[in-house]
From Swiss-Prot:
It is found in: Cytoplasm. One of its GO terms (biological process) is vesicle-mediated transport. Residues 321-335 have a biased composition (Polar residues). Belongs to the GET4 family. InterPro entries: GET4, TPR-like_helical_dom_sf. It comes from Aspergillus fumigatus (strain ATCC MYA-4609 / CBS 101355 / FGSC A1100 / Af293). The gene is get4. This is Golgi to ER traffic protein 4. It holds the Pfam family GET4. Its main location: cytoplasm. Component of the get4/get5/sgt2 sorting complex. Keywords: Cytoplasm, ER-Golgi transport, Transport. Residues 317-346 are annotated as: Disordered. Component of the get4/get5/sgt2 sorting complex involved in the GET (guided entry of TA proteins) pathway that leads to the insertion of tail-anchored (TA) proteins into the endoplasmic reticulum. Get4 and get5 form an obligate complex that catalyzes the transfer of tail-anchored proteins destined to the endoplasmic reticulum from sgt2 to the cytosolic targeting factor which then targets the TA protein to the ER membrane via get1/get2. The lineage of its organism: Eukaryota, Fungi, Dikarya, Ascomycota, Pezizomycotina.
Amino acid sequence: MTSRIDKTIARQREKIASGAYYEAHQQLRVIAARYIKQSNYEAAAEILAGGATALLRAGSQQGASASGGDLAIMLVDEVYTKAGWGITGGDDDAEGRARKKRLIELLREFPSEEPTRKRFIQEMIGWSGRFGPVERGDAELHHAAGSVYAEDNEPYDAEKHLVLGTSESAETLAKLEYEWYTNDEPHTAAIYASRAVFPYLLVGNLRNANKAFLVFTSRLSSSNTSLGVQEVSSASSDVRVFPSLPLLNFISMLLLTIQRGSADLFKQLTAHYASQIREVGIWDDALSQIGEQYFAIKVPRQGNPLLDMMGSMLFGGQNQGGSRRTPQGRSQSKTVEAPPASMELD
Protein backbone atom coordinates (compact mmCIF):
# COMPACT_ATOMS: atom_id res chain seq x y z
CA MET A 1 0.00 0.00 0.00
CA THR A 2 2.80 2.40 0.89
CA SER A 3 4.43 1.79 -2.50
CA ARG A 4 1.13 2.53 -4.23
CA ILE A 5 0.69 5.76 -2.27
CA ASP A 6 4.26 6.81 -3.00
CA LYS A 7 3.66 6.29 -6.72
CA THR A 8 0.45 8.31 -6.55
CA ILE A 9 2.19 11.20 -4.82
CA ALA A 10 5.11 11.02 -7.27
CA ARG A 11 2.74 11.24 -10.27
CA GLN A 12 0.98 14.26 -8.83
CA ARG A 13 4.28 15.93 -8.04
CA GLU A 14 5.25 15.55 -11.69
CA LYS A 15 2.00 17.29 -12.67
CA ILE A 16 2.71 20.07 -10.19
CA ALA A 17 6.28 20.46 -11.46
CA SER A 18 4.90 20.85 -14.99
CA GLY A 19 2.51 23.58 -13.84
CA ALA A 20 -0.69 21.52 -13.89
CA TYR A 21 -1.67 22.76 -10.43
CA TYR A 22 -5.44 22.65 -10.79
CA GLU A 23 -5.45 19.15 -12.28
CA ALA A 24 -3.17 17.80 -9.54
CA HIS A 25 -5.24 19.51 -6.86
CA GLN A 26 -8.50 17.98 -8.06
CA GLN A 27 -7.05 14.50 -8.51
CA LEU A 28 -5.49 14.57 -5.05
CA ARG A 29 -8.84 15.53 -3.52
CA VAL A 30 -10.61 12.69 -5.34
CA ILE A 31 -8.00 10.09 -4.38
CA ALA A 32 -7.96 11.23 -0.75
CA ALA A 33 -11.77 11.22 -0.58
CA ARG A 34 -11.77 7.62 -1.82
CA TYR A 35 -9.44 6.55 0.99
CA ILE A 36 -11.49 8.50 3.53
CA LYS A 37 -14.66 6.74 2.39
CA GLN A 38 -12.85 3.44 2.99
CA SER A 39 -11.79 4.70 6.45
CA ASN A 40 -8.18 4.34 5.34
CA TYR A 41 -7.19 7.55 7.08
CA GLU A 42 -3.46 6.92 7.14
CA ALA A 43 -3.37 6.63 3.35
CA ALA A 44 -5.51 9.74 2.96
CA ALA A 45 -3.21 11.65 5.31
CA GLU A 46 -0.12 10.72 3.30
CA ILE A 47 -1.78 11.70 0.03
CA LEU A 48 -3.01 15.05 1.34
CA ALA A 49 0.18 15.97 3.19
CA GLY A 50 2.38 15.05 0.23
CA GLY A 51 0.21 16.91 -2.25
CA ALA A 52 -0.20 19.96 -0.02
CA THR A 53 3.55 20.21 0.48
CA ALA A 54 4.26 20.12 -3.25
CA LEU A 55 1.61 22.72 -4.08
CA LEU A 56 2.65 25.06 -1.27
CA ARG A 57 6.24 24.91 -2.43
CA ALA A 58 5.12 25.87 -5.94
CA GLY A 59 4.16 29.29 -4.59
CA SER A 60 1.22 31.53 -5.41
CA GLN A 61 1.47 31.24 -9.20
CA GLN A 62 -1.84 30.18 -10.74
CA GLY A 63 -3.27 29.54 -7.28
CA ALA A 64 -0.86 26.71 -6.44
CA SER A 65 -0.38 27.67 -2.79
CA ALA A 66 -4.13 28.21 -2.34
CA SER A 67 -4.67 24.67 -3.62
CA GLY A 68 -2.03 23.43 -1.20
CA GLY A 69 -3.75 25.25 1.63
CA ASP A 70 -7.05 23.63 0.68
CA LEU A 71 -5.49 20.16 0.88
CA ALA A 72 -3.87 20.99 4.23
CA ILE A 73 -7.23 22.09 5.64
CA MET A 74 -8.85 18.95 4.22
CA LEU A 75 -6.20 16.91 6.03
CA VAL A 76 -7.30 18.35 9.38
CA ASP A 77 -11.05 18.46 8.75
CA GLU A 78 -11.59 15.25 6.82
CA VAL A 79 -8.85 13.04 8.24
CA TYR A 80 -7.64 14.11 11.68
CA THR A 81 -11.10 15.12 12.89
CA LYS A 82 -13.19 12.43 11.20
CA ALA A 83 -10.78 9.73 12.29
CA GLY A 84 -10.91 11.04 15.83
CA TRP A 85 -7.13 11.07 16.05
CA GLY A 86 -6.14 12.33 19.46
CA ILE A 87 -3.08 13.43 21.37
CA THR A 88 -2.48 12.57 25.01
CA GLY A 89 0.58 14.72 25.53
CA GLY A 90 2.44 11.91 27.29
CA ASP A 91 5.97 10.77 26.56
CA ASP A 92 4.64 7.50 25.17
CA ASP A 93 2.32 9.19 22.67
CA ALA A 94 4.48 8.57 19.59
CA GLU A 95 1.50 8.68 17.22
CA GLY A 96 0.31 11.99 18.62
CA ARG A 97 3.76 13.52 18.27
CA ALA A 98 4.02 12.30 14.68
CA ARG A 99 0.63 13.79 13.81
CA LYS A 100 1.57 17.14 15.31
CA LYS A 101 4.93 17.05 13.53
CA ARG A 102 3.18 16.56 10.19
CA LEU A 103 0.99 19.62 10.80
CA ILE A 104 3.89 21.78 11.96
CA GLU A 105 5.94 20.83 8.91
CA LEU A 106 3.00 21.71 6.66
CA LEU A 107 2.52 25.03 8.44
CA ARG A 108 6.10 26.01 7.70
CA GLU A 109 5.56 25.36 3.99
CA PHE A 110 2.90 28.08 3.71
CA PRO A 111 4.04 31.28 2.02
CA SER A 112 3.50 34.14 4.45
CA GLU A 113 1.10 35.87 2.06
CA GLU A 114 -1.11 32.78 1.54
CA PRO A 115 -4.62 33.58 2.92
CA THR A 116 -5.46 29.94 3.71
CA ARG A 117 -2.69 29.76 6.30
CA LYS A 118 -4.78 31.44 8.98
CA ARG A 119 -7.65 29.00 8.41
CA PHE A 120 -5.23 26.06 8.57
CA ILE A 121 -3.88 27.31 11.89
CA GLN A 122 -7.40 27.70 13.27
CA GLU A 123 -8.35 24.17 12.22
CA MET A 124 -5.09 22.73 13.55
CA ILE A 125 -5.50 24.36 16.96
CA GLY A 126 -9.20 23.48 17.04
CA TRP A 127 -8.48 19.82 16.37
CA SER A 128 -5.87 19.67 19.13
CA GLY A 129 -8.26 21.30 21.58
CA ARG A 130 -11.06 18.91 20.73
CA PHE A 131 -9.00 15.73 20.75
CA GLY A 132 -6.23 16.66 23.17
CA PRO A 133 -5.94 17.18 26.92
CA VAL A 134 -6.05 21.00 26.78
CA GLU A 135 -9.24 22.64 25.53
CA ARG A 136 -7.49 25.82 24.41
CA GLY A 137 -5.22 23.81 22.11
CA ASP A 138 -1.89 22.03 22.15
CA ALA A 139 1.00 24.15 23.44
CA GLU A 140 3.46 22.95 20.79
CA LEU A 141 1.06 23.81 17.99
CA HIS A 142 0.43 27.23 19.52
CA HIS A 143 4.20 27.77 19.72
CA ALA A 144 4.63 26.77 16.07
CA ALA A 145 1.86 29.13 14.94
CA GLY A 146 3.11 31.99 17.10
CA SER A 147 6.67 31.53 15.88
CA VAL A 148 5.58 31.67 12.24
CA TYR A 149 3.65 34.87 12.86
CA ALA A 150 6.60 36.33 14.78
CA GLU A 151 8.97 35.57 11.90
CA ASP A 152 6.59 37.38 9.56
CA ASN A 153 6.38 40.41 11.89
CA GLU A 154 2.71 39.90 12.67
CA PRO A 155 2.83 40.64 16.41
CA TYR A 156 -0.88 40.61 17.22
CA ASP A 157 -1.40 37.13 15.80
CA ALA A 158 1.90 35.95 17.29
CA GLU A 159 0.93 37.12 20.79
CA LYS A 160 -2.34 35.19 20.79
CA HIS A 161 -0.55 31.91 20.19
CA LEU A 162 2.74 32.39 22.03
CA VAL A 163 0.96 33.15 25.30
CA LEU A 164 -0.58 29.65 25.09
CA GLY A 165 2.62 28.00 23.90
CA THR A 166 5.56 26.22 25.49
CA SER A 167 8.37 27.38 27.75
CA GLU A 168 10.25 28.36 24.58
CA SER A 169 7.44 30.73 23.63
CA ALA A 170 8.36 33.20 26.37
CA GLU A 171 11.70 34.00 24.76
CA THR A 172 10.15 34.24 21.30
CA LEU A 173 7.47 36.63 22.55
CA ALA A 174 9.90 38.78 24.52
CA LYS A 175 12.23 39.14 21.53
CA LEU A 176 9.28 40.03 19.31
CA GLU A 177 8.09 42.72 21.73
CA TYR A 178 11.59 44.11 22.10
CA GLU A 179 12.10 44.38 18.34
CA TRP A 180 8.73 46.11 18.10
CA TYR A 181 9.74 48.46 20.90
CA THR A 182 12.90 49.55 19.06
CA ASN A 183 10.67 51.28 16.50
CA ASP A 184 9.01 53.37 19.20
CA GLU A 185 10.05 56.00 21.73
CA PRO A 186 12.61 54.93 24.38
CA HIS A 187 10.29 55.72 27.31
CA THR A 188 7.68 53.18 26.11
CA ALA A 189 9.71 50.11 27.14
CA ALA A 190 7.28 49.09 29.89
CA ILE A 191 4.33 49.07 27.48
CA TYR A 192 6.02 46.48 25.30
CA ALA A 193 7.39 44.51 28.25
CA SER A 194 3.86 44.29 29.66
CA ARG A 195 2.66 42.72 26.42
CA ALA A 196 5.13 39.91 27.05
CA VAL A 197 4.45 39.59 30.79
CA PHE A 198 0.78 40.32 31.58
CA PRO A 199 -0.75 37.72 29.23
CA TYR A 200 1.31 34.95 30.88
CA LEU A 201 0.18 36.13 34.31
CA LEU A 202 -3.45 36.13 33.20
CA VAL A 203 -3.25 32.51 32.05
CA GLY A 204 -1.47 31.51 35.26
CA ASN A 205 1.98 30.95 33.76
CA LEU A 206 4.23 32.80 36.21
CA ARG A 207 7.35 31.00 35.01
CA ASN A 208 6.94 32.24 31.44
CA ALA A 209 6.08 35.72 32.70
CA ASN A 210 9.38 35.89 34.60
CA LYS A 211 11.32 34.44 31.68
CA ALA A 212 9.81 36.91 29.21
CA PHE A 213 10.61 39.84 31.49
CA LEU A 214 14.20 38.67 31.95
CA VAL A 215 14.74 38.29 28.19
CA PHE A 216 13.21 41.70 27.45
CA THR A 217 15.15 43.60 30.12
CA SER A 218 18.40 41.80 29.28
CA ARG A 219 18.11 42.97 25.69
CA LEU A 220 17.16 46.45 26.82
CA SER A 221 20.14 46.84 29.16
CA SER A 222 22.67 45.33 26.75
CA SER A 223 21.49 47.50 23.86
CA ASN A 224 21.27 50.72 25.89
CA THR A 225 24.35 51.02 28.06
CA SER A 226 23.49 54.64 28.93
CA LEU A 227 20.40 53.58 30.88
CA GLY A 228 22.41 53.29 34.07
CA VAL A 229 20.83 50.05 35.24
CA GLN A 230 21.30 49.37 38.94
CA GLU A 231 21.53 45.90 40.47
CA VAL A 232 19.74 45.73 43.84
CA SER A 233 20.20 42.62 45.97
CA SER A 234 18.53 41.43 49.13
CA ALA A 235 18.55 38.21 51.10
CA SER A 236 15.94 36.68 48.81
CA SER A 237 15.96 38.68 45.58
CA ASP A 238 18.16 40.23 42.93
CA VAL A 239 16.46 43.03 41.01
CA ARG A 240 17.47 45.25 38.11
CA VAL A 241 16.37 48.83 38.67
CA PHE A 242 15.91 51.18 35.72
CA PRO A 243 15.99 54.70 37.22
CA SER A 244 14.56 56.36 34.10
CA LEU A 245 11.84 53.73 33.49
CA PRO A 246 9.69 53.51 36.63
CA LEU A 247 6.96 51.35 35.10
CA LEU A 248 9.52 48.75 34.14
CA ASN A 249 10.46 48.63 37.82
CA PHE A 250 6.76 48.25 38.62
CA ILE A 251 6.53 45.12 36.47
CA SER A 252 9.64 43.72 38.15
CA MET A 253 8.19 44.35 41.61
CA LEU A 254 4.84 42.93 40.53
CA LEU A 255 6.47 39.62 39.61
CA LEU A 256 8.22 39.49 42.99
CA THR A 257 4.98 40.32 44.79
CA ILE A 258 3.12 37.53 43.02
CA GLN A 259 5.81 35.04 43.99
CA ARG A 260 5.38 36.05 47.63
CA GLY A 261 1.59 36.09 47.51
CA SER A 262 1.33 39.28 49.55
CA ALA A 263 -1.92 41.17 48.98
CA ASP A 264 -0.74 44.04 51.17
CA LEU A 265 2.43 44.46 49.12
CA PHE A 266 0.37 44.36 45.91
CA LYS A 267 -1.85 47.17 47.21
CA GLN A 268 1.20 49.16 48.30
CA LEU A 269 2.85 48.64 44.92
CA THR A 270 -0.15 49.69 42.82
CA ALA A 271 -0.74 52.72 45.06
CA HIS A 272 2.90 53.78 44.75
CA TYR A 273 2.78 53.72 40.95
CA ALA A 274 -0.86 54.84 40.63
CA SER A 275 -0.14 58.06 38.73
CA GLN A 276 2.12 56.35 36.18
CA ILE A 277 -0.38 53.52 35.73
CA ARG A 278 -3.15 56.04 35.10
CA GLU A 279 -0.99 57.73 32.49
CA VAL A 280 -0.58 54.44 30.62
CA GLY A 281 -4.35 54.07 30.62
CA ILE A 282 -4.56 50.43 29.51
CA TRP A 283 -3.38 48.41 32.50
CA ASP A 284 -6.35 48.83 34.84
CA ASP A 285 -8.32 45.75 33.77
CA ALA A 286 -5.21 43.57 33.66
CA LEU A 287 -4.10 44.62 37.13
CA SER A 288 -7.60 44.16 38.54
CA GLN A 289 -7.66 40.63 37.16
CA ILE A 290 -4.17 39.94 38.52
CA GLY A 291 -5.23 41.26 41.93
CA GLU A 292 -8.20 38.93 42.01
CA GLN A 293 -6.40 35.94 40.52
CA TYR A 294 -3.30 36.01 42.72
CA PHE A 295 -4.36 37.94 45.83
CA ALA A 296 -8.14 37.38 46.08
CA ILE A 297 -8.75 41.13 45.84
CA LYS A 298 -12.20 41.43 44.33
CA VAL A 299 -12.99 44.58 42.40
CA PRO A 300 -16.57 45.15 41.12
CA ARG A 301 -16.54 45.10 37.33
CA GLN A 302 -19.00 44.66 34.51
CA GLY A 303 -18.65 42.23 31.65
CA ASN A 304 -15.66 39.95 31.26
CA PRO A 305 -12.58 42.02 32.13
CA LEU A 306 -10.14 39.33 31.01
CA LEU A 307 -11.59 39.07 27.53
CA ASP A 308 -12.11 42.82 27.29
CA MET A 309 -8.55 43.54 28.32
CA MET A 310 -7.03 40.97 26.00
CA GLY A 311 -9.09 42.22 23.11
CA SER A 312 -8.41 45.91 23.59
CA MET A 313 -4.88 45.97 24.95
CA LEU A 314 -2.78 42.86 24.81
CA PHE A 315 -3.94 41.32 21.58
CA GLY A 316 -4.78 44.58 19.88
CA GLY A 317 -5.92 44.72 16.31
CA GLN A 318 -4.60 45.41 12.87
CA ASN A 319 -5.10 48.17 10.42
CA GLN A 320 -6.62 47.38 7.08
CA GLY A 321 -3.25 46.70 5.57
CA GLY A 322 -2.44 44.11 8.22
CA SER A 323 0.77 45.91 9.17
CA ARG A 324 2.12 46.46 12.63
CA ARG A 325 1.04 49.52 14.58
CA THR A 326 1.71 51.03 17.97
CA PRO A 327 -0.09 49.33 20.90
CA GLN A 328 -3.28 51.02 21.99
CA GLY A 329 -3.09 53.37 24.91
CA ARG A 330 0.60 54.21 24.60
CA SER A 331 1.28 57.43 26.42
CA GLN A 332 2.29 60.27 24.14
CA SER A 333 4.14 62.03 26.95
CA LYS A 334 7.90 61.81 26.67
CA THR A 335 8.53 62.85 30.27
CA VAL A 336 11.03 60.64 32.06
CA GLU A 337 9.71 60.28 35.58
CA ALA A 338 11.87 60.31 38.65
CA PRO A 339 13.10 56.97 39.98
CA PRO A 340 10.80 55.36 42.53
CA ALA A 341 11.46 55.49 46.23
CA SER A 342 13.08 52.35 47.56
CA MET A 343 10.71 49.53 48.44
CA GLU A 344 11.34 46.72 50.84
CA LEU A 345 12.45 43.60 48.98
CA ASP A 346 12.50 41.20 51.90
